[in-house]
Amino acid sequence: MLARSIQKYYIFVLLFLLAILQSSCQQSGNKYRILVVHSYESDYVAYKDCDRLIRESLEKKGINPSIQTFYLNCEQYAAPAEEKRMYLYLDSISTWKPDLILVYEDQATYTLMQCHHPLISTVPIVFGGVNFPNKALLAQYSNVSGFWDEPDYVTNIRLIEHLLGKSTIYMLHDSTYIDRHIKATLHEQCAQADIRVDNNRIMYIPVEIATLDRVNQSLKRPDSTTVNVVPVQGDKLSAVSWYMSKHVPYIYYLQAKRDYRVLNTSRFSSKPSFTAINEDLGYTNKLVGGYITSLETQIEESTDRAAEILKGSPSESFPQITKSKKNYVFDFNEVKYWNIDKRLLPKDAILLNFPFKAQYPRLFW
């Protein structure tokens, strides 16, 4: 009787091991080659999490990925050099034959299509985190589809007003393709919401015309919330420094893009800063939060689409542009640092860097 029980036990163990071996063989046999293309530099702080989330999300969807990653480093190169780098890189991996390309953010998505490498027309491509998709360029590639992270400036403006009261919100712009679209979209959205937008308005008072009345007026809370779009060029930079200082109340920064000209604005500001995009939120740039497509949502959406394509759905069967889901997302550390009343946060808000002890206080009484 004992011998028979032992025999059954060994048979069960053997069958279990065979099942694991078979599953392992199937997974290794179905390995998919996926190229991931990022816009920014390789040491951008969020990419470590981003790349981990991509792999984990694909594996949860039954995809066993073999991943290669290319970092465009868009801040270091002008457009022609970016396109050449992209073309040469695609040449170098052509023999690897990727099954699918995942590309993130505006610069990499545009450059990938604009370089016109033959590979781009034959491999399914899924983009994510794109604020301003180039529809004319997309129309040339039926195999490209993805997710439009359309910035919602008005909701973010109203969020700042809700948390901090009537304010002047300043945004920084340059003359790039993305900057032109930011400015046009901002004006369009604010016009519909009856929010005044000023361009290049200097809000500090030069010493030669300063009077006590003018200075006192500049320190008062405004009667309504407005937006001031400030160029990051020439003499306007002194205004930016003034806005960042603690000497002028009721003026707050709203991040609309990530590039070298504006990268450290929130970090060095003496007042709370907010964001309409997910870049840098929850990391080192002292951003309180905003109404955005979170990094997690960005990865989930794009890898969902990628998995469907790899499992047999034609890439042409999806709409080329799908709007991304948005949430209120805040960095708990910055909310606490700036002493923002947590009761004012939207009830469905996502809190990054929320400590376990704060989440379950009764465990630490």
Regions found by a protein language model. Give the residues of each.
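Short hydrophobic alpha-helices and adjacent helix-cap/hinge residues
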Residues: 2-6, 25-365
